[in-house]
């Protein structure tokens, strides 16, 4: 390919990859399979390698991270990034509203239009776009001077390296919050504990630690994301309000929360605050309050700023999700990789409406650092679905009877040697036949998100182990009706159901089978990538590290873990036995020419005949796409009982709304 043809093709590939990055990471509406995306990305890398003079700073290939820096350079913000004044009560909100009205000399009875947004618990940053290209990214710092973290921010997939649309502004400074979703935070901490590294205390610390890496390649491996919420300096564009500004950011491809809303007066703010309080635990990321801003930019300018905070905005904080209780005992437990984790048994206490009786202590180094002892009075914190953690010891409450739990000399489950690996914080059982590791690996294999052996839970698996009927996961496929009838209080019907569940698991999707194997560092998402890329367990078992590294989102650590797993003779024998028993994982392919091909569905509310995930699979099996949010490109919204904001948005956008029965008629070909 000559240079001119290469230049044209590179431009096409970059535009296409940017479009699909935006669809995947911002809109949650992927149109390509991972394999199709990877093919585009590899073609771009190959062409840029052949024509290095055509590489540009805004190319998607620049997201991978570069050589480590010695230190971050400083960046002075053109307009200071101010902090917000806090409010905690209904009275505080009313007082803020009254101050705004007094400052604007509004007549009695006139209400202010506010924009309310969730207050994200992450790291504040500023993005600078010059003529549409991201040139500088920096942290807030002290509000006047921050750190230049441009290379790291370029690895965040939801941040466009180039703005969408024609005629971008000469200068657009955008402020926002970089954060780590809760599910990603849990995966990251689980991975760190397996690797013997100290876990992050909370998602905010994880986001800050990830973004402030001197080696941007480490940042690139962390699934950070961002929501934009405020302007800095702007030249070449003009906005009249916060609502108009957020709308313009969306049109330019920048990530903006879908929960921002214009409200009127104190009543509107309070209603929004209560709504977010209720939604807080259902969100996939951590929020710690609500930000309230005067919507009108002219009114914001009239109100002005104090030395450290604007007069036109306030942060309404949620009550803390903490409680004080007593550690009644500390119990070591063994995971499926042999890591021994201390867990605190607590005097039951209610935190944010949930009764908490256990808290993770992570590892012995963390216990020593916090000086946590049995009998201590402690402060615990619960965040979303994250396991509660001890955040502080109230040493002033000690009586002298408290005692520290030392690292066990032997595995509490099998008595094998316990080793603390150098440069790791993890303590591991070295027993190859440790019953706790075997138990946890079988529980994981049979679990709902893995092989989904319905009914075969922890209680029955422990009985199988106690009776010596299973020694690893392959033994599950050798069980008979007579084996189950040896259980306490086991009926023939239940035994038959368990055998049917095991039999049904033989045809599970390949991605589930890969996840079920318990390969270190391979979660559900990575398992799906591997299933798409290799198509069979045999192909994956033969894959080289180089082949694995060619897959988007697979790094050296994961690749090495996968090859190590399949090079192990015992693991290969286990898989061979399962295949001989009839385990035949399937690869789901979208139906070509299905009745929903090219159509996007969104499900909201409670469905009667099936779960939402089952309905989404039905759509995908007919060639359609099941999205998580409503947009102008949504074709149908299927509304069940108690449908919420998605139904309202569908009506606003004129999207066709279907009842559950109407969706079934379409599925069965009656419409």
UniProtKB/Swiss-Prot annotation:
CDD domains given in the database record: BRCT_DNA_ligase_like, LIGANc
Reaction catalyzed: NAD(+) + (deoxyribonucleotide)n-3'-hydroxyl + 5'-phospho-(deoxyribonucleotide)m = (deoxyribonucleotide)n+m + AMP + beta-nicotinamide D-nucleotide
UniProt-annotated binding residues for NAD(+): 34-38, 83-84, 117, 140, 177, 293, 317
Signal sequence segment: none
Keyword tags: DNA damage, DNA repair, DNA replication, Ligase, Magnesium, Manganese, Metal-binding, NAD, Zinc
Keyword Magnesium: yes
UniProt xrefs under InterPro entries: BRCT_dom, BRCT_dom_sf, DisA/LigA_HHH, DNA_ligase, DNA_ligase_AS, DNA_ligase_CS, DNAligase_adenylation, DNAligase_N
Cofactors, names only: Mg(2+); Mn(2+)
Record-annotated membrane-spanning stretches: none
Catalytic residue positions: 119
GO molecular function: DNA binding; DNA ligase (NAD+) activity; metal ion binding
GO biological process assignments: DNA repair; DNA replication
E.C. code: 6.5.1.2
GO cellular component terms attached to this protein's record: cytosol
Primary enzyme class: ligase
Ranges for domain BRCT: 591-671
Residues holding Zn(2+): 411, 414, 429, 434
Stored PANTHER family: CHROMOSOME TRANSMISSION FIDELITY FACTOR 18 (PTHR23389), DNA LIGASE (PTHR23389:SF9)
HAMAP family tied to this protein: DNA_ligase_A
Its biological purpose: DNA ligase that catalyzes the formation of phosphodiester linkages between 5'-phosphoryl and 3'-hydroxyl groups in double-stranded DNA using NAD as a coenzyme and as the energy source for the reaction. It is essential for DNA replication and repair of damaged DNA.
Family, similarity comment: Belongs to the NAD-dependent DNA ligase family. LigA subfamily.
Name the UniProt record assigns to this protein: DNA ligase
Name of encoding gene: ligA
């Amino acid at each position: 390919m000559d240079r001119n043809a290469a230049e044209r093709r590179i431009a096409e590939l970059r535009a296409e990859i940017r479009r699909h990055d935006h669809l995947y990471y911002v809109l949650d509406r992927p149109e390509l399979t991972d394999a199709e995306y990877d093919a585009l990305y590899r073609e771009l890398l190959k062409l840029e390698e052949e024509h290095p003079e055509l590489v540009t700073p805004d190319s998607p290939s620049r997201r991978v991270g570069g050589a480590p820096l010695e230190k971050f350079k400083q960046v002075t913000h053109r307009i200071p990034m101010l902090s917000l004044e806090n409010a905690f009560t209904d009275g505080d909100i009313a007082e803020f509203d009254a101050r705004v009205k007094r400052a604007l000399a509004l007549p009695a009875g006139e209400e202010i239009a506010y924009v309310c947004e969730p207050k994200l618990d992450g790291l504040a940053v500023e993005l600078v776009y010059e003529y549409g290209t991201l040139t500088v990214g920096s942290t807030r710092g002290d509000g006047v001077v921050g750190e230049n973290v441009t290379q790291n921010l370029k690895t965040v997939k939801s941040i466009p390296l180039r703005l969408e649309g024609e005629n971008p502004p000469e200068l657009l400074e955008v402020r926002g919050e970089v954060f780590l979703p809760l599910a990603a935070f849990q995966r990251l901490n689980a991975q760190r504990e397996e690797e013997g590294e100290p876990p992050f205390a909370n998602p905010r610390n994880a986001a800050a630690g990830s973004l402030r890496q001197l080696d941007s390649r480490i940042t690139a491996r962390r699934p950070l994301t961002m929501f934009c919420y405020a302007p800095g300096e702007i030249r070449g564009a003009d906005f009249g309000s916060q609502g108009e500004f957020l709308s313009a950011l969306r049109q330019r491809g920048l990530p903006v929360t879908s929960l921002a809303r214009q409200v009127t007066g104190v009543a509107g703010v309070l209603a929004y605050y209560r709504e977010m309080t209720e939604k807080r635990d259902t969100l996939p990321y951590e929020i710690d309050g609500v930000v309230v801003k005067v919507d009108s930019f002219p009114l914001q300018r009239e109100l002005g700023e104090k030395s450290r905070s604007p007069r036109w905005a306030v942060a309404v904080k949620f009550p803390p999700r903490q409680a004080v209780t007593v550690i009644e005992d500390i119990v070591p437990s063994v995971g499926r990789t042999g890591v021994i984790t201390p867990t605190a048994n607590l005097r039951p206490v209610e935190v944010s409406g949930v009764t908490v009786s256990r808290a993770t202590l992570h590892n012995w180094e963390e216990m020593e650092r916090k000086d946590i002892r049995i009998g201590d009075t402690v402060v615990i914190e619960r965040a979303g679905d994250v396991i509660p953690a001890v955040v502080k010891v109230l040493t002033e409450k000690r009586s002298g009877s408290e005692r520290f739990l030392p690292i066990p000399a032997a595995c509490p489950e099998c008595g094998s040697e316990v080793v603390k690996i150098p440069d790791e914080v993890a303590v591991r059982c070295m027993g190859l036949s440790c019953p706790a590791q075997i138990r946890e690996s079988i529980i994981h294999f049979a679990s709902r998100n893995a092989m989904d052996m319905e009914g075969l839970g922890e209680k029955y698996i422990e009985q199988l182990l106690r009776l010596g009927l299973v020694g690893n996961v392959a033994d599950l496929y050798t069980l008979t009706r007579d084996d189950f009838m040896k259980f306490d209080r086991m009926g023939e019907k239940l035994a038959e159901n368990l055998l049917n569940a095991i039999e049904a698991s033989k045809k599970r999707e390949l991605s589930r089978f890969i996840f079920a194997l318990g390969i270190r560092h391979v979660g559900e998402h990575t398992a799906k990538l591997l299933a798409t890329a290799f198509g069979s367990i045999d192909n994956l078992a033969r894959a080289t590290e180089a082949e694995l590294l060619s897959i988007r989102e697979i790094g050296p650590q994961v690749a090495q873990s996968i090859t190590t797993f399949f090079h192990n003779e015992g693991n290969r024998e286990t898989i061979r036995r399962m295949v001989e028993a009839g385990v035949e994982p399937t690869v789901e392919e979208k139906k070509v020419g299905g009745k929903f091909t090219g159509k996007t569905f969104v499900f909201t509310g409670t469905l009667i005949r099936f779960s939402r995930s089952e309905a989404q699979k039905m759509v995908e099996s007919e060639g359609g796409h099941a999205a998580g949010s409503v947009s102008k490109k949504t074709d149908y919204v299927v509304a069940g009982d108690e449908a919420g904001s998605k139904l309202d948005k569908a009506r606003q956008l004129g999207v066709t709304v279907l009842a559950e029965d109407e969706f079934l008629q379409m599925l069965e070909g009656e419409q």
